Amino acid sequence: MTQATSIGSWLVLMAVMGVVSPLFSIGGNAMVADLIPNHQRAQAYALLRTAINLGVVTGPLIGGWIIAEHSFQTAFWTAASLLLLLAGLAHWFLQETRPELKKDTPQSKQSVWKDRHFITILLFYTFSVMGLIEMFILMPIYLEQNFQILENQSSLLFSVNALIVVLFQYSTTRWASRFSPFLMMAVGALIYALALGSIPFLETFVFFIVAMMVLTIGEMVINPTVTSYVSNLAPDHMRARYMGMLEMVYRVAMGTSPLVAGLINDLVAPSWIWVYGSLITLVGAAGFISLYLGRFGKN
């Protein structure tokens, strides 16, 4: 990034980053599932999310200090050096955790796409994430264009989100683990819908922060629950494939939801962005409720 001087070079870098960045979450989530018993996985994924968001809170602060005292180039070189160091530590100290594949397991003939239950969960989760993505991608633009709240102020929303996750993710997940996973997925999606649906009625920055806090509660409920459920659902030797498909939900949502919302902004009205986001998350919530009722009926 220190050598990127044009839009074209940045596009190439972003494309490479888009391919490489999911590898950590896929491998990390699969490794957690290999190491942790089923009944403790939700808490383990909560701790993993806490660590990631701790980096989200502290990284920009450290990076901003380096930029202020030195330069952008120094900040990028420092980040690259730390990542190389971490890659080396992971290579030398982390051991393979994937269970050995039994000889009679028809690995080559198995396909993630044939697991209809899993694909159904992915579909409903995609609807939920499509609403979530709006808050992180479109909110700064919405605030600047309609309320003259600049990016250096709106970035506080994301710091609040990360800080709440650091402080409350583990305790929230322990509470949510007492209930049906499908029920908690539905609750998380409904909280998304509530937060997004409130935004057209807000006019002051303090209330936008409150909306982000509400959204974060939904995020803390649904994300570890889905990840834990999928890790339990996946066969041992196909865990990384299932986690890869789960990670793809975010890529699909990031590629589609801002595009649809942008068209709504241009053709209808800016406030209808959030109506769309709320409705799409309600579709996800309805799907999870149907799964919960179906499982409840069987039990």
What are these regions (language model features)?
Residues 95-123:
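Juxtamembrane intracellular "pre-TM" segments in multi-pass secondary transporters
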Residues 137-153:
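Short amphipathic helix-loop junctions that connect adjacent transmembrane helices
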Residues 82-99, 287-292:
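C-terminal membrane-cytosol helix-exit motif in multi-pass small-molecule transporters
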Residues 1-5, 191-203:
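C-terminal ends and interior cores of transmembrane alpha-helices
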Residues 240-266:
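A late C-terminal transmembrane helix in Major Facilitator Superfamily
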Residues 168-180, 265:
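Helix-to-loop junctions at the C-terminal end of transmembrane segments
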Residues 8-13, 121, 206-211:
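Short hydrophobic/alpha-helical segments at membrane-entry points of transmembrane helices
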Residues 15-52:
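Cytoplasmic helix-loop-helix junction between adjacent transmembrane helices
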